[in-house]
């Protein structure tokens, strides 16, 4: 039997940090210095915790990962949490596995709204924080100010006296050093290891009781199938042990454990037996779902289901019906798209997928635009083709009143842009909650704004601040609907009237009508949007027209054609840009924007129908 000493030397901790505050780098350094990687400070791929391509590219952590460190006879399980509120479903489950949280805050930025979201959840779980002020060596670092901000945030979140009595460690994760004073850092991360060991309580568990654990994460491996990950609540587990699985509806079935896998560094290894308090992965139980309880066959007791925040944004995923459908993607049918969405549901708990009366269309709901755009981007990289509609917020009936979701927004801008940003947010029904000038020419603004007011705002915001502004948002609450339309696009679009190759000569003539989105010699189709009109109406244009060569002598007299650089949209920008009658066509090679109705006649007919119904 694993003795009591071992449990006393076990620590389970989650890391919370805002995007780009250095959490992943911090974990890398802890792994290296603890000697968990063979060579301390050896050749380790940077940002080891971000395993998904998209995560490394965007620098955000989407899926929570587990890792374990051995340090001076102690075993520290570290679980990474996503820093973004759109992945709130992940956060809830992680917190159910740990006994404390490590809050990493940038020594210049201070706490951000995403950190606020996860910290609030951690306090609700009764966890005590350890605060790490990171990047203390960066220019402009103001660690004392940041500590005050963190304290104020904790008070606002209703922290208990115990939670407010938190230890503070100052660090520079990039250099791998930490200390108890920001002027006096040690040679390595030892002060942080010591703080974790001293301040995190060992798991309070019953070792001799019958086995019980809850699945809080899932993984999949082609060789062993579904892998369930969770913390053992009580008792112990061995490979080949018979167990009972209880799902969230209370239905039970029998199973037999395959392997029991422990974590060390970023690897998993097989264990002969694992005990209460440890975070393990188990195989061999077939289809598992998050929140399932696995327990001893003689003591069938379910643990309470994990609650997950409801989705706030919905959009339609449709089969690609454009004339170029199937040219670039590997998976294009509705069956393939539905299978992929159902596979995503297994581990992406905050996602909802509903079939609609139209077999080629699925309604997909999630925690926010980012949550859904990450899924679309992953599908696109895997070879899927699909079309997606404009995101819409999900309204709820609460006590007989229709309510809409609101977001908390933190904006950091230069003072010269403050007026135009505040005006734009006012038009989108935002309410100012706080305004903090930093005395160095920048201002931090806190807003509460309806979620629909933020859809499509980020692009405008970047233009307004010439790319210097920072904008972070996280779901706040549901409240009464604010009247009126919000965030309608001001400009119309230029629509191609035929299918073929766009010619430079035609595009040159269209430049004065607005901004183009395509280069010359690109294949386009009828109904594809090729530019942004400078006025508010849509314009159907011919971009295939070559130069007439009737009068031979004059044919070369024109000035050379000069085309301005076209506007190129990323996936998120395209989703924010489109209107209700438009779709974003997503393929592994391209992102195109199109009208739902491709021909001008169909669009006119649809317009006539809507105007006649609205006049009656």
Curated annotation (Swiss-Prot):
Keywords in alphabetical order: Cytoplasm, GTP-binding, Hydrolase, Nucleotide-binding, Ribosome biogenesis, RNA-binding, rRNA-binding, tRNA-binding
Protein role: A 50S ribosomal subunit assembly protein with GTPase activity, required for 50S subunit assembly at low temperatures, may also play a role in translation. Binds GTP and analogs. Binds the 70S ribosome between the 30S and 50S subunits, in a similar position as ribosome-bound EF-G; it contacts a number of ribosomal proteins, both rRNAs and the A-site tRNA.
Location in or out of the cell: Cytoplasm
Catalytic activity as recorded in UniProt: GTP + H2O = GDP + phosphate + H(+)
Enzyme's top EC category: hydrolase
Subunit structure: Monomer.
GO cellular component, one term: cytosol
Origin: domain of life: Bacteria
Listed Pfam families: BipA_C, EFG_C, GTP_EFTU, GTP_EFTU_D2
SUPFAM superfamilies in alphabetical order: EF-G C-terminal domain-like (SSF54980), P-loop containing nucleoside triphosphate hydrolases (SSF52540), Translation proteins (SSF50447)
Biological processes per GO annotation: ribosomal large subunit assembly
Ligand binding (GTP): 20-25, 134-137
EC numbers on record: 3.6.5.-
Protein name: Large ribosomal subunit assembly factor BipA
Domain tr-type G positions: 8-204
Family under the similarity heading: Belongs to the TRAFAC class translation factor GTPase superfamily. Classic translation factor GTPase family. BipA subfamily.
A molecular function (GO) term: rRNA binding
HAMAP family: BipA
């Amino acid at each position: 039997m694993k003795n009591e000493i071992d449990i006393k030397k076990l620590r389970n901790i989650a890391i919370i940090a805002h995007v780009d505050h250095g959490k992943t780098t911090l974990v890398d350094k802890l792994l290296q210095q603890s000697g968990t990687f063979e060579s301390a400070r050896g050749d380790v791929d940077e940002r080891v915790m971000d395993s998904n391509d998209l995560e490394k590219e965007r620098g955000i952590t989407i899926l929570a990962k587990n890792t374990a460190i051995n340090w001076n006879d102690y075993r520290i399980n570290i679980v990474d949490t996503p820093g973004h509120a759109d992945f709130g479903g992940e956060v809830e489950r992680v917190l159910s596995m740990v006994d404390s949280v490590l809050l990493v805050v940038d020594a210049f930025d201070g706490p951000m709204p995403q950190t606020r979201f996860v910290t609030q959840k951690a306090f609700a779980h009764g966890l005590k924080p350890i605060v790490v002020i990171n990047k203390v060596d960066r220019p402009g670092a103001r660690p004392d100010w940041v500590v005050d901000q963190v304290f104020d945030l904790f008070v606002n979140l209703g922290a208990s006296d115990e939670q407010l009595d938190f230890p503070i460690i100052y660090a520079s994760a990039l250099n791998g050093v930490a200390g108890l004073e920001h002027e006096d850092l040690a040679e390595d991360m030892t002060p942080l290891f010591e703080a974790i060991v001293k301040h995190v309580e060992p798991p309070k568990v019953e070792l001799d009781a019958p086995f019980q654990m809850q699945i809080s994460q899932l993984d999949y491996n082609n060789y062993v199938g579904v892998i369930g990950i969770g913390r053992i609540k009580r008792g112990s587990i061995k490979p080949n042990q018979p167990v009972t699985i209880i799902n969230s509806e209370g239905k039970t079935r029998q199973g037999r454990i395959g392997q029991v896998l422990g974590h060390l560094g970023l690897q998993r290894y097989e264990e002969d037996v694992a005990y209460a308090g440890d975070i393990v992965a188990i195989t061999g139980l077939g289809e598992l779902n998050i929140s399932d309880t696995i327990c001893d066959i003689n003591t069938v007791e379910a643990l309470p289901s994990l609650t997950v925040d409801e989705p706030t944004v919905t959009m339609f995923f449709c089969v690609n019906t454009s004339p170029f459908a199937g040219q670039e993607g590997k998976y294009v049918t509705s069956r393939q798209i539905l299978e992929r969405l159902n596979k995503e549901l297994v581990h992406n708990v905050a996602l909802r997928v509903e079939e609609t009366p139209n077999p080629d269309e699925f309604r997909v709901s999630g925690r926010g635009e980012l949550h859904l755009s990450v899924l679309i981007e992953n599908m696109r990289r895997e070879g899927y083709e699909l079309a997606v509609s404009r995101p819409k917020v999900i309204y709820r009936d609460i006590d007989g009143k229709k309510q809409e979701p609101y977001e908390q927004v933190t904006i950091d801008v230069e003072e010269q842009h403050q007026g135009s940003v505040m005006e734009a947010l006012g038009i989108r029904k935002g309410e100012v909650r706080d305004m903090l000038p930093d005395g160095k020419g920048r201002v931090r603004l806190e807003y509460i704004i309806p979620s629909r007011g933020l859809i499509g705002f980020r692009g405008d915001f970047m233009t307004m601040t010439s790319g210097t502004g920072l904008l972070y948002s996280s779901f706040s609450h549901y409240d009464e609907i604010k009247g009126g339309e919000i965030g309608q696009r001001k400009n119309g679009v230029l629509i191609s009237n035929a299918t073929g190759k766009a010619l430079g000569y035609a595009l040159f003539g269209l430049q004065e009508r607005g901004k183009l989105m395509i280069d010359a010699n690109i294949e386009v189709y009828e109904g594809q949007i090729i530019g942004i009109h400078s006025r508010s109406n849509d314009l159907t244009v011919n971009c295939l027209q070559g130069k007439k060569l009737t009068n031979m002598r004059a044919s070369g007299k024109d000035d050379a054609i000069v085309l301005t650089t076209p506007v190129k949209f990323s996936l998120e920008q395209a989703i924010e840009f489109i209107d209700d009658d438009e779709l974003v066509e997503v393929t592994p090679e391209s992102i195109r924007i199109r009208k739902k109705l491709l021909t001008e006649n169909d669009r006119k007919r649809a317009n006539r129908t809507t105007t006649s119904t609205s006049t009656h």
